[in-house]
């Protein structure tokens, strides 16, 4: 390979590497954003689950508060 061909090849590889570094950093930032969003959504699911559980238990009256069934 001639020196100019080697130099051209080296420049191409350096250009590819620079592009890949930018792409990797962008992907890393995207992953970080997704992790934050997943964490936020998990917390929302936990809060909603707790809210549903509390509503379910509040809908069931204790036996002592139940009205007796009608007698026919």
From Swiss-Prot:
Region annotation Disordered: where it falls in the sequence: 52-72
Polar residues composition-biased segments: 54-66
TM ranges: none
Pfam families: SlyX
Family from the record: Belongs to the SlyX family.
Protein name as catalogued: Protein SlyX
Species annotation: Pectobacterium carotovorum subsp. carotovorum (strain PC1)
